[in-house]
Amino acid sequence: MAKLTKRQKAIAEKIEAGKAYNFEEAATLLASLPAAKFVESYDIAVNLGVDPRKSDQVVRSATVLPHGTGKTVRVAVFTQGPAAEAALAAGADRVGMDDLAAEMKGGDLNYDVVIASPDAMRVVGQLGQVLGPRGLMPNPKVGTVTPDVATAVKNAKAGQVRYRTDKNGIIHTSVGKIGFEADKLKENVEALIADLKRIKPASSKGIYVKRVTLSTTMGPGLVIDQSSLNV
């Protein structure tokens, strides 16, 4: 068995195994643990009562967190004409069509979100092997293929998070950064879970939100007592 580091030992001493934590208690405890050498994110994992092997039970969507994620988001938009002007006015970092595609093919992929208007998909379609592996391919299911690119840019800049159930039926996403006030972090998590419940697959049976776990980038995961959340 690998020997625990000094930091891991200090963390283990503060964690109570098997406990379901009140949300505020969990957030405060995670923030008090020995810090990494960078500002860590708060991450959430939500175990859903779905069978991800069934296409009609794959949960995929996006949520605009009321207090954002604390991250600076770089956005590229594939569109043209008045929509291009609207995207720039909304805060897009780069707007283009074939010229932008050429830049991305050349390796310029310093973006967190890529958005496209429907008429631009003929260009974006050529970038599947470039954008797909990085999770950047625009998709109408998460609002990144839309005629209203300006709103999509505003949402991305405001802290919209995108998620999809993994092979175990769990969604993972960041919900803030260390330094967030516990009440704002809680409201972000509640907004996410409310959206997950809103898009519950009709074929999902039994308990839908089975477990909620809060962690930091380099820290442990703490199971949250769901009765401490207003959802």
Swiss-Prot record:
Keywords: Repressor, Ribonucleoprotein, Ribosomal protein, RNA-binding, rRNA-binding, Translation regulation, tRNA-binding. One of its GO terms (molecular function) is tRNA binding. One of its GO terms (cellular component) is cytosolic large ribosomal subunit. One of its GO terms (biological process) is regulation of translation. The keyword Endoplasmic reticulum does not apply. It comes from the Bacteria. Pfam families: Ribosomal_L1. Binds directly to 23S rRNA. The L1 stalk is quite mobile in the ribosome, and is involved in E site tRNA release. Protein L1 is also a translational repressor protein, it controls the translation of the L11 operon by binding to its mRNA. Belongs to the universal ribosomal protein uL1 family. Part of the 50S ribosomal subunit. This is Large ribosomal subunit protein uL1. It comes from Pseudomonas putida (strain ATCC 47054 / DSM 6125 / CFBP 8728 / NCIMB 11950 / KT2440).
